[in-house]
Amino acid sequence: MQTEVILVPVIQLDGHLTVEEAEAIVFEEKPIRISPESLAKVDASHRALLRALGEGKPIYGVNTGFGALSRTRIPDPELKSLQLNLIRSHATGVGKPLPDPIVRGILLFRLNSFLQGASGVRREVVELLGQMLKHRVYPVIPEQGSVGASGDLVPLAHLALVLVGEGRARYRGEELPGGEALRRAGLSPLTELFPKEGLALLNGTSAMLSILFCTWVWARRVFRAALGIASLSFQALRGSTQPLDPRLHRLRPHPGQIEVAEQLRALLSQSRLTDTFEGDVQDPYSLRCLPQILGPVWEVLENVGKTLSIEMNSATDNPVVLPEGEVLCGGNFHGQILALAAEELGIALTILGNSCERRLNLLLNASERGLPPFLARTPGRSSGLMLLQYTAAALSAENKVLAHPAAVDTIPTSGGKEDFNSMGATSSWKAWRILGNVAHQVALEAVAARWAIGFWGEEKLSPATRRIYAKLSEIIPPPGEDQDLSPVLGQVAELIQKGGIESYGL
């Protein structure tokens, strides 16, 4: 009997990574291969650094101290120990370990940054990062400690320790000493760090970039699910489709507004519930203004994606080493661009969650539109879904606090030498936490929409949303007696974050 061989596509890394490739590597654990041409660029940069070092000139972080100690000149015999001292002294993170997808992203983005050929590291460093990705050796990196300038020094120090056989790492679900994790994966740690290699590993935006990237990937899934579930609510409330008329949106042609209106028209096409309520000439804003509310959210997602695409293919090191041998000191490690993108994303997601809470409130108080109070079978004896809105309101309140920008709250470090930090990692973490809350708010609206449609009959839904409704009905029970819905809400939120709703409908 012949065994079928399934070939898994390998993604080649050459310093030009697409967001689609990054998503496949980070979330689907697709295998990678480093292109020979990129390794040649790495070799050239390393040789250029050694030539510059041989000229005896001071080079920041290579033969000098770091930060406020940069005026201290380091003698040649101590240059390698300087790099090891750096990563040990900077590993001061606290808090819970970062989840595996974010750590995979950090490994990937640090590796891809080195493939720009401007960091001066040896190919052995690059290849070990690639092997750790391949064999799923994930450094244990605490979530707190980065101020988002001079790169993500603290989290990346915890990563760097594993490369030299120190620190801690997860391998096959077990947390181990870093050297043991490498050994079990059949890998060997670096026996020493050459000049600049410790600094190159630490001095970059890879941690805040990975947190923001993972948030953005899931945010797109949540947004698409939210649009489909809003379409269910729209029908349950018998909303008017007149505000979706393309002629209206051509008069205010913001791309996101036009896109969302078009998506809603497609989702609601052939519905037998829309345009059946005649009790008012206009619907509430959370229905009527869906394109104007969610269109800007769509545009933020598009803009953040463009920022991520540039950043993941950038050299975010300092100093940088040009192939011709010149060493330039600068600030490519500074995370301000990511901090602002993360703040914008967090605010946009908060708005998305707020709109879910408002439609949920409409569904629970829609007696004039033919639905029972709180969607209860026997109002009074049963509270129905009354408390869903409480939870949604609590999540909105939390998100409104998290949406306050950390990026405007810079705190100087290193004796004032680093006097303007981005706080980009904090901004990215806030967006990540907001996203988790919004996924639950979308789930809360989904439960109410599923119950509300149950009173009308799913056969009246548009064909596109009928498929969404069927998927939700596999998890959400029909309208009935009071029951504990907390486990259901968790399952729906997980389905949404995994993209289980976005593939249904259109």
What positions do the PLM features span?
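Well-ordered mid-protein domain cores that form the structural environment of catalytic cofactors
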Residues: 116-134, 138, 149-153, 161, ...
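Short, charged/polar low-complexity linear motifs in solvent-exposed/disordered segments
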Residues: 79, 86-87, 172, 421
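C-terminal auxiliary extensions adjacent to catalytic cores
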Residues: 5-30, 36-41, 45-53, 162-506
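FAD-binding core of FAD-dependent oxidoreductases
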Residues: 60-82, 89-112, 142-164, 180, ...
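Polyanion/phosphate-binding surface patch
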Residues: 57, 72, 260-261
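Short, surface-exposed linear patches
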Residues: 81-84, 129-130, 222-225, 418
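Glycine-rich, flexible loop motifs
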Residues: 6-56, 86-141, 234
